[in-house]
Amino acid sequence: MAATRAAPKTASKKEHQYCLLDSQEKRHGHYPFSFELKPYGQTGANIIGVQGSLTHVIKMTVFPFMIPFPLQKIHIDDFIGGRVYLFFKELDVQAISDVNGMQYHFEFKVVPVSSNQVELLPVNNKYKFTYAIPEVQYLTPIFYDLSGPLNFPLDTLSVHVDSLTNHIQLPIQNHNLTTGDRVFISGYKHLQTIELCKNNKIFIKCIPPLSSEKIKLYIPKNRIRIPLYFKSLKNV
């Protein structure tokens, strides 16, 4: 009788990948945040680069990062319980559920930094999945506290500029720009200081010559960058 040979065991190795979810690289037409993750060789506008495909993900780690004050908050005491929670929509099948039925992957302590920003310090910076996630291609982070979802001011605005009067016409009035804020103007590499902010117009001392009257205005104080570290199992 011929002996039956056991099938060889497939070994697995652990891979680690880091990515930075940058709000200025969110997917077009997706607000507030939604990101597409692709290997570095395929990166371009509105793509978050990773070393390779994120498959068989078993653990996710987050590090401290800054956020602007949400539109619903004015003071640090407005954060109920001094906590903020982060939930990834695509990973909803594996998440922590709190007593209110809300889901999250990470809990943060809110630490004041300035009148414009707070720092989020992870209470537990690691989330281990019960079952490996087959693939992570998109991530949509949702922030909330015990009062509900948090909405943030935009970090990029499409605006009209008048070089003759050195003013920029804002598309909305409920922005959070104020005198003294520093902004980037598309096509010009230096930070510009807002000399005066009145209604839905901001005035800058010297607006550089631009090829178009319609430009992008980048607002550094509103930018959110979420540092994540993934651990995956790969067959070898």
Swiss-Prot record:
Induction info: Expressed in the late phase of the viral replicative cycle.
Gene Ontology CC: virion component
UniProt subcellular location: Virion
Key words of the record: Late protein, Virion
Keyword Amino-acid biosynthesis appears in the UniProt entry: no
Keyword set includes Protease: no
Function: Forms the penton at the fivefold vertices of the icosahedral capsid. Together with the minor capsid proteins (p17, p49, and M1249L), forms a complicated network immediately below the outer capsid shell, stabilizing the whole capsid.
Homology family: Belongs to the asfivirus H240R family.
Protein name: Penton protein H240R
Species of provenance: African swine fever virus (isolate Warthog/Namibia/Wart80/1980) (ASFV)
